Amino acid sequence: MPLIEQYDVVVVGAGHAGCEAAMAAARMGLRTALFTLNLDLIAQMSCNPAVGGIAKGHLVREVDALGGIMGELADAVGIQFRLLNTSRGPAVWSPRAQCDKQQYRVKMREVLESQPNLYIKQAEAVDVVVEDARVTGIRLRDGRTIRAGATVITTGTFLNGLIHCGEERIPAGRSGEPPSVLLGESLKQLGLRGCRLKTGTPPRLDGRTIDWARFEEQPGDADPTPFSFRTKTLPMRQISCHIAYTTPETLRLIRENVHRSPMYSGQIEAIGPRYCPSIEDKVVKFPDKDRHQFFLEPEGLNTHEVYVNGMSTSLPMEVQYEIVRSIPGLENAEMLRPGYAIEYDAIDPTELDRSLRVKKFEGLYLAGQINGTSGYEEAACQGIMAGINAALSVRDDAPFTLNRTEAYTGILIDDLISKGTNEPYRMFTSRAEFRLHLRIDNADRRLTPYGRRLGLIHDEAWADYEAKQARAVTLEKLLATRKIKDVTPLAPALAQAGITDAASLAGQTYAQLLKRPEMSIEALWTVIRAEVAEGEAASLFAPWFTNAEEASQPLPAFVRNELKSVETEIKYAGYLDQQRKSMEKLKKAETRVIPEWFDYASVSGLSREMQEKLVRVRPQTIGQASRIPGVTPAALSLINVYIEIQGKRLAKGGHPVQV
């Protein structure tokens, strides 16, 4: 008799999506099992040992604000922190951290193993169990059946994975690990539409064989910005990365051997990530460029392994050696691991609804690269959403979704389920219609109340959140109401900002002064400090002065971040109000639900092509339908009218379609 185990939620795959999914479900009180092919490689950073980056840092902040774990882990093992895009406006500032690859994996396992309700298992899932259009669990290669109220699949690049290095082809989920073939076939048998995608990774070098003096040093920020709102200190020693460039000899070697690249020989037919091209792709597509930049990034404090960011390649190993050694400073470099490309199966994300549930089956959720995305951060935000909704479904509660006005996470999911993707999807700030509202500094204000309601934010974190919001409200009110009586104390700040009309400031509020583009809130710190340190709200602001008794001491990072958030709300108030009006219009479209029974074929005036697209995606709202490529405003108006027509027929006891 086969062995059967029972859980509330089962998660397949312990990468960045799977870990977030399992933690979310367990923290919500559900008995959760997390299955992985190798317990020692949980949360493995298969590619770049870094978290965050432009737009990706926004996703990490959102995961953290909801109660996820990626941000805190990156802070705990980060060895270089940089805040990117600071030359532009605060809407697009984004944190990035180089991480200790080994410590990230170790720390993640510690966190998972210490979580009540969570059981981590090493085994291979080979089949999805389906009963009456409901997924009821999985089967393992060892014969066990794992029954669960909800199943989350987060297999990354493992579904029918195939590695390419030159002419060599190796079935693998990633280097050194077997692919998941049987589970891939099981998902195909469910009738889900799929595609074949490709990604790649660069060679790793031995840092002891690099002449570091030949490269430009790239240090981290002197005062690092953490990912997590809950992080108090950054414990790891900080180190530098280095900037390098290809040479004419590098380009010659690539051009002469490009026919041996699987991408150009026809060996790989899958589509790779547009915004993370291989080095051979760069050389072919940008023939006029005489050099390409790349970065030498240490993989940790206790290893000599160096990641060559910007040199992803699947050229033969001997060619990779020549390419590396064509660069001054790398003439004697030893390659620890070659770069490679990997093809894998993905599911068409238009098969999913907004909760990341597969529409055709109850109880089945997908997250991460299986949905056509690229990147740890894109995976993590899907993982926490899938885990939350898997838990809610077991409780028979309504799903939790985020829309495009609330979070980059909502934008990512909406893009996937509305438009699908034929290449690995990467998040950018340009994908957001309202990015001034979706900043890194206000991710907690946007999402932490949701996390608290769901049971993902513990009491101490919630108390810190409430205190922070109270400080922001108090400070905004103070700056908006307190008028400048004497400009003398402001003289240094005004001089630094280049403001010469000091006399005209008398009678203005500090908020009016702060609206000037050249004025920063930190320049007003002396005035603010005097107001909040001894005023009625002194106890509320006490955390600001714990480590800064003297006014001359540098501001702690969290104080600076809170001040900057208040400054942004004041300085961009007019633009924020304009965006709120546009957001309300979008929200109205999102509340207009398209019923599941709606028949597009009966809508007179819809072209066959448009009908096919709408039937394929099955949008849940008019707003989602509007974002399907090719669906026109006229078509949306028709759908709106026919929802009423078909609804009235149904209400009279008939069929929604006139027959």
UniProtKB/Swiss-Prot annotation:
PROSITE patterns, A to Z: GIDA_1, GIDA_2
Residue numbers binding FAD: G13, A14, G15, H16, A17, G18
Protein family: Belongs to the MnmG family.
Role according to the record: NAD-binding protein involved in the addition of a carboxymethylaminomethyl (cmnm) group at the wobble position (U34) of certain tRNAs, forming tRNA-cmnm(5)s(2)U34.
Chain residues that bind NAD(+): 272-286
Lineage of source species: Bacteria, Pseudomonadati, Acidobacteriota, Terriglobia, Terriglobales
SUBUNIT field: Homodimer. Heterotetramer of two MnmE and two MnmG subunits.
Cofactor(s) named in the record: FAD
The protein's name in its UniProt record: tRNA uridine 5-carboxymethylaminomethyl modification enzyme MnmG
Gene Ontology cellular component list: cytosol
Localization per record: Cytoplasm
Keywords: Cytoplasm, FAD, Flavoprotein, NAD, tRNA processing
GO molecular function: flavin adenine dinucleotide binding
Domain of life: Bacteria
GO BP term (any one): tRNA methylation
Stored PANTHER family: GLUCOSE INHIBITED DIVISION PROTEIN A (PTHR11806), PROTEIN MTO1 HOMOLOG, MITOCHONDRIAL (PTHR11806:SF0)
Pfam family for this entry, one: SAM_GIDA_C
InterPro entries (alphabetical): FAD/NAD-bd_sf (IPR036188), GIDA_C_N (IPR049312), MnmG (IPR004416), MnmG-rel (IPR002218), MnmG-rel_CS (IPR020595), MnmG_C (IPR026904), MnmG_C_subdom (IPR047001), MnmG_C_subdom_sf (IPR044920)
Gene giving rise to this polypeptide: mnmG
